[in-house]
Amino acid sequence: MKNSSIVLASASPRRSELLESAGIQFRVVPADINEEPLPGEEPVDHVQRLAEGKARAAAELAEGRFFLGADTIVLCDGEIMGKPKDAVDAERMLKKLSGVPHEVVTGFAIYDRERKGAVVEAVRTKVFFKHLRDEEIRDYVATGCPFDKAGAYAIQGGAAHMVRKIEGSYTNVVGLPLCEVVDALRVIGALGN
C-alpha cells in the first residue's frame, strides 16, 4: 500500500499513526480552514464539508494527486462538540458525556487532483461512557489530554477507562475510520490495486 502521491491534510498525530498502521505511505500537509458550522448545517454535512475543504486546501499548498482531509466531532443531545476552548469547557463537555451515549462522527474526503473530484463520506460510531465522578473529570482535564480532541477525550489514551462500550468503528473514535478510508483509497486508485 505504498504511494507517495497521497497527502494527509491534517496535523493530527493520531491520523498519521492510523495511516502508518495500515502501511500507507503519505506526506503531511496540514490545511487550515474556517471550521465554524454554517447556520442550520447538519452535523454530517458539517464534517463532510470541512473534510473536503481541508483536502482541497492542501491541494493548493502541495504537489501530489490524492489529498485526504478529515474532521471529527462528538454529538451529544444535539450539541456539536469540537475541541474544548479551555479547561472549563473540557470539564463541561465531559460532564455532559458522563453516563450517556453519544456519537462520534468523522467526515473524510479524498480529493483527486487529476480527476478534479472528491470522494466524501461520513462514519458514525456510538460511544457509551460510564458515569464520571467530578474528581475523575478534573484529574483527566489536568493531564492536558483533552485540549486537542473533539469532545475533550481520547479513547486510545487516558480516557479509555471512561468508555463502557462502543458500537461501530474504533478507529473512527480515534479520528479516522481506517477501514472506510482504505477502501475508498483503493476504489479511486490511490493504492495502485
Curated annotation (Swiss-Prot):
Q: Which NCBIfam families match?
A: maf, PRK14368.1
GO process terms (BP): nucleotide metabolic process
Uppermost EC category: hydrolase
Please state the Enzyme Commission number of this protein. Answer: 3.6.1.9
Family, as annotated: Belongs to the Maf family. YhdE subfamily.
Q: Which SUPFAM superfamilies match?
A: ITPase-like (SSF52972)
Q: Which domain of life is it from?
A: Bacteria
Q: What does this protein do?
A: Nucleoside triphosphate pyrophosphatase that hydrolyzes dTTP and UTP. May have a dual role in cell division arrest and in preventing the incorporation of modified nucleotides into cellular nucleic acids.
Q: Which organism is it from?
A: Geobacter sp. (strain M21)
Write down what this protein is called: dTTP/UTP pyrophosphatase
Please state where this protein is localized. Cytoplasm
Question: Which molecular function GO terms apply here?
Answer: dTTP diphosphatase activity; UTP diphosphatase activity
The answer on whether this UniProt entry bears the keyword Cytoplasm reads: yes
